[in-house]
Amino acid sequence: QGFLNGFIDLIAAGKNGRVCVIDYKSNHLGSRLADYGQAAMSEAVSEHHYYLQALIYAVATARYLKQRRALPESIHVRYLFVRGLNPHGQEGLWCWDIPVSALQEWLE
């Protein structure tokens, strides 16, 4: 009975059919690259309910795509923690690949 309001920063589609939902996060997890490792980012994702946000964004993206083309096997959600991005490592990049089959009940 309510409404949600939000914005997906970027949806990227590759030639191979891969679809990525990209959201930029400005959370301050520390002042060192090491502070933006997988454990710290996962803690922030949990603490700020970003798992729920990822699911909502994945459902919204799948609904949009379903009207326009074949659905991919997965929606690849990427949170870019911009304060900790490292072009030479995985710091600052949080990933969750959500199978579209897990979203089916919300796509009907």
Language model features with spans:
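Structural signature of nuclease core domains in nucleic-acid processing machines
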Residues: 1-108
